[in-house]
UniProtKB/Swiss-Prot annotation:
Organism of this sequence: Polaromonas naphthalenivorans (strain CJ2)
Superkingdom of this protein's organism: Bacteria
PANTHER family: LEUCINE--TRNA LIGASE, MITOCHONDRIAL, LEUCYL-TRNA SYNTHETASE
Protein name: Leucine--tRNA ligase
Pfam families to which the protein is assigned, alphabetical: Anticodon_1, tRNA-synt_1, tRNA-synt_1_2, tRNA-synt_1g
GO biological process: one example: leucyl-tRNA aminoacylation
Family: Belongs to the class-I aminoacyl-tRNA synthetase family.
Subcellular location: Cytoplasm
'KMSKS' region (motif): residue ranges: 640-644
Designated gene of the protein: leuS
Amino acid sequence: MQDKYNHLDVERSAQTHWNAADAYRVTEDASRKKYYACSMLPYPSGKLHMGHVRNYTINDMLSRYLRMKGYNVLMPMGWDAFGLPAENAALKNGVPPAQWTYDNIAYMKKQMQAMGLAVDWSREIATCDPSYYKWNQWLFLKMLEKGIAYRKTQVVNWDPVDQTVLANEQVIDGKGWRTGATVEKREIPGYYLKITDYAEELLGSVQHKLPGWPERVKLMQENWIGKSEGVRFAFLHDIKDASGALIGDGQMYVFTTRADTIMGVTFCAVAPEHPLAVHAAASNPALAAFVEECKSGGTTEAELATQEKKGQPTGLFVTHPLTGDKVEVWVGNYVLMSYGDGAVMGVPAHDERDFEFAKKYGLPIKQVTDVKGQAYSLDAWADWYGDKQHGIAINSGKYDGLAFKAAVDAIAADLAALGLGEKKTTWRLRDWGVSRQRYWGTPIPIIHCDEHGAVPVPEKDLPVVLPMDCIPDGSGNPLHKHEGFHAGVVCPVCGKPARRETDTMDTFVDSSWYFMRYCDPKNSEAMVAGGADYWMPMDQYIGGIEHAILHLLYARFWTKVMRDLGLVKVDEPFTKLLTQGMVLNHIYSRRTDKGGKEYFWPHDVEHVLDDTGKIAGARLKNAVGDLPVGTAIDYEGVGTMSKSKNNGVDPQDIIEKYGADTARLYTMFTAPPEATLEWNDAGVEGSYRFLRRVWNFGVKLNAMNSGANGADAACAKGLFDKETKALRLEVHTLLKQVDYDYQRMQYNTVVSGGMKLLNALEDFKGEISAASLAALREGFSVLLRCLYPAAPHLTHALWSELGYAAEAGDLLDTPWPEVDASALQQDEIELMLQINGKLRGSVTVPAGADKAVIEAAALASEAFVKQAAGAPAKKVIVVPGRLVNIVV
């Protein structure tokens, strides 16, 4: 056994052993309890970052612990391999996205293996492999058959540089998230999935079927689905288009959740794309210019809520359905055509957005709800405008005096009687547009025929294989001009020459079901089969909070579609969800002469502290470029590790210098899994020192071990002296706590428990005998098993070197240690001793002592005799198991 801990040798040896044993390959076994634990599959960007290390270590600790607990554990890994970054890399480096992607996969896989992850690599998938995306295409065709997938033309966000559609979430301040180009509104055809058909179930399941999910994530999904109950009704008009036909059949529909305020309408606003806006703009240059301006504005509800409210009158009027009053129509930049009917009623007295708009343009404000008798006031308005729980209708004619619900019911009934409205439930959720004008994605299995239009590719011809030799040049989708992609393509209906669909699928499609493919990854005959019946639903899913809405919602929807098609039996894919915290580091920068920012690596910087020891600034401790040592720079606090801010830490550097076990241990010990982790180099050093202490104690114990390998046989009650019993009490007390912390996935306290356990072993001062050596060996075996999920390489080596493997087998499959109840039984207990309520010492009594024995021991104690100074005890209060208080 080596005297000094050499992490390189230890980790290389352990990984060689595991690989030779094919240690992590798992098969379905109906006789065993299963547990499926999975981290969200990574995008193969090139290198792992510390966020990856933290995520995968959380999963690995859970998997190893449960395997020791007897579970049949599946921990798979794969690659979310399609996406725009590969195309951007191709543009930059002149290599096909496929080559860039597979090179990155190979490198990142080596990094993961160096971490010692218990991954079953036989189940590895890459979403860019035709054997995987074939099933994207197959299910898409099934959705077409069932009417879940459909084609339509819709106004979309168009990035003119990337030549692609952007989701609302990818438009930031009117610009493309990647290119920064001003986003345009365009009408183009594309394929959509009817996720809205599942809105009610998706919402209901969030509320009732996901108890193992964080409340924060569930609330985010509820808000995204956005169920609203209200009234949809029409304003009448006689506005005609150029052909003389009434626009919208003479009706302009709106939806409101506040029908009780309908009598307070003083204007209406429509989206720039609304037919009335388009009609009015045709003869109004100022309005036409405003409509064009709106195209570069925000496209999400969040952006519209914060941007300045702007409008332009159309010169058109509609008729109020209940009063007959004429209501002016405006175009508003805060109205979305994609939500509701693209028009809203303006009730500035009782809606914050309408109020802001009306104040800006001097529009009338009419109060129609009285709240707690308060007089209407522009100053006090914001405090009560939305109080619908206590409002009473006023200035509303026949509805005066009605409370909110009664007013809504009465108004809805009157609108229905007129044939102009009805109660309705609406949803914020919109159908999922899956068409992308990009190359590196799953080809949509459609053939376009001049005679028969869009025709599905026959199942026998799947997969439609993506050409692997394309190198995007920035001029749009290269599939348009790739001759091989279209060569020999004929219409499945008539057999005439045709062309393939060149749009590819949104990459969220790839990640919406990959976790099911892990269950049966090599099956060429079925998308999923018996493996999914065994492993699904997933027991624990681990990933970042940034995926709370889109990925998790789409995965839930995809699962329900697969269930309805008879492919799986589960309603929800993920039983429990853990969203791990981000890894943060210090950020240092300075303004450049050109007004930009230059960021500095933390290893080049030292802090400047104020009188209280707080960070007041920073300066260079190493020369950087032309900047000398001592140059003052700005300290921006801590933030997420980022390449752009030079505050990332390369896991490879940590693994090479300290070892994978140190990287794993540090990321687990520093903060609970759900909390953010602030990087600290000193903490990494501390984790390494702890592992070195564990190794050193193993060396010491190995030297003490003179053939006393029968630890379990020697550990029998009655063979131990007082010090040894105290050691065993501490060992099994800590084991009980660590086991509980593993069950709660509180891995920071798991590691701290291991540290306390090592302290107890190191601090043992008893006489070394066969019995005490057996107790030390028992304690160290408990420590190794407790630390094994966090530091598998070191514990594997020590387990073997100290002879535990010869007794109990490979640590990988050694059962979790059992708490010895007899070790927790104490012969004596120590009670706090108080005199007149103040702590003065302690008293030791037999564990089963009654009150009389405890009182006698307390009164005879040295502490009482000294403090009482001869004064008699007036009263003795005993709190069993805790303290004795003597009143004198």
